[in-house]
């Protein structure tokens, strides 16, 4: 089998993470201070896939190009492919046909995280050479997913959000294809959603007698499309954190557990209970940083408590008077409590934001 190429889909609108994704691609929202997209690129490179195409949308493509560059920082060669409209995964495959050519390839949804990466999956594909290999994971609510019906490791059919699921094994968003997928995708008509569905293209391969096999996820998998999933992914990644202190910790501060403290960062009269990561140039003063917290580059936290949260670069959290927990703050957000009476709330809140006051 000739070398595999990689195809990462990063064109989605990220509606479930608004308002963060009004101004940023959802695949660039960080987990443990690293954009989710970068985990996918690194997983492909680790599996030996170094020629990678990234599907981008016109609205967020420039930001993704600026972040990932030409791929050299990952040891990869990246080509950017514009999908003019979100017309389905099979449409994205067809959009990338010129890049893929006749090569087999890995298709990876750019907001996924896999603990154990792709190395074993790619090895299975190259060793056994099925026409398609799909990654599956057990879920508690298969009615909410695309689900596979299996005969051993062979997939008999795929069913989208079944009322009576034939299994609890859901599609993860990682697929390995040969070039046969292009003709299958071309044969499709748009679904009721107006999209070309990848599940229908795979079913076409099954109907044509092609070999479509499955592998079950080893370790954990997370789709980071919603706040709760993003925070859980952050927790899972931080669970495996290795301590690295490059910044300054004064004598009045206390660090318990594992911490990554970036260069130029400062802890002053503060307590950090890890696992936690604090980015370059961040300043934590008279504050408490609790477990499973990611503080971005240049963030200032003063006289406040933050736990189980993600705070993006350049933000300020100051004088809150209560603990902030299970939260995601975007870039350059300023969150403060003013002194004086009367005790009131003064808010400037963008469209489709969510604020919970306790």
Predicted stretch roles:
Residues 114-189:
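Conserved core of the sugar-phosphate nucleotidyltransferase
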Residues 12, 111, 138, 226:
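Active-site glycine-centered loops adjacent to acidic/histidine catalytic or metal-binding residues
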Residues 1-8, 16-22, 29-30, 34-109, ...:
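Conserved N-terminal catalytic core of the sugar/cofactor nucleotidyltransferase
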Residues 12, 59, 179-180, 228:
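Alpha-helix/helix-capping structural signal
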Residues 1, 180, 187-358:
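Left-handed beta-helix
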Residues 81-83, 135, 215-217:
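Conserved beta-strand termini and adjacent loop/short-helix elements that scaffold enzyme active sites
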Residues 29, 174-175, 223:
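Residues that recognize and position ribonucleotide moieties
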Residues 28, 148-150, 214:
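A structural signal for short hydrophobic beta-strand segments in well-ordered beta-sheet cores
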């Amino acid at each position: 089998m000739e070398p595999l190429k990689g195809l990462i889909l990063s064109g989605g609108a990220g509606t479930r993470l608004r308002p963060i994704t009004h101004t940023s691609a959802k695949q660039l929202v960080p987990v443990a201070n690293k954009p989710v997209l970068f985990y996918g690129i690194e997983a492909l490179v680790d599996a030996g896939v170094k020629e990678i195409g990234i599907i981008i949308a016109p609205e967020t493509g420039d930001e993704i190009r600026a972040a990932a560059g030409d791929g050299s920082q990952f040891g990869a060669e990246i080509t950017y492919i514009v999908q003019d409209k979100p017309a389905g995964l099979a449409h994205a495959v067809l959009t990338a046909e010129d890049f893929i050519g006749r090569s087999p390839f890995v298709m990876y949804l750019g907001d996924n995280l896999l603990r154990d990466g792709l190395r074993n999956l790619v090895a299975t594909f190259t060793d056994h050479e099925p026409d398609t290999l799909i990654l599956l994971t057990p879920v508690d609510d298969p009615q909410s997913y695309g689900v596979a019906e299996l005969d051993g490791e062979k997939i008999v059919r795929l069913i989208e959000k079944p009322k009576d699921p034939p299994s609890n094994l859901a599609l993860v968003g990682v697929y390995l294809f040969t070039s046969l997928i292009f003709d299958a995708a071309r044969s499709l008509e748009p679904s009721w959603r107006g999209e070309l569905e990848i599940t229908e293209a795979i079913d076409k391969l099954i109907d044509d007698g092609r070999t479509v096999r499955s592998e079950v996820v080893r370790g954990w998998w997370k789709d980071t499309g919603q706040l709760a999933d993003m925070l859980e992914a952050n927790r899972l990644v931080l669970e495996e954190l290795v301590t690295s202190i490059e910044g300054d910790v004064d004598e009045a501060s206390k660090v318990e557990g594992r911490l990554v403290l970036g260069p130029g960062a400062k802890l002053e009269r503060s307590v950090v209970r890890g696992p936690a990561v604090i980015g370059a140039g961040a300043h934590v003063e008279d504050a408490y940083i609790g477990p499973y917290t990611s503080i971005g580059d240049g963030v200032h936290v003063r006289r406040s408590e933050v736990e189980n949260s993600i705070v993006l670069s350049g933000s300020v959290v100051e004088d809150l008077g209560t603990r902030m927990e299970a939260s995601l703050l975007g870039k350059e957000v300023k969150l403060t409590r003013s002194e004086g009476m009367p005790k009131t709330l003064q808010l400037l809140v963008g469209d489709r934001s969510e604020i919970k006051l306790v």
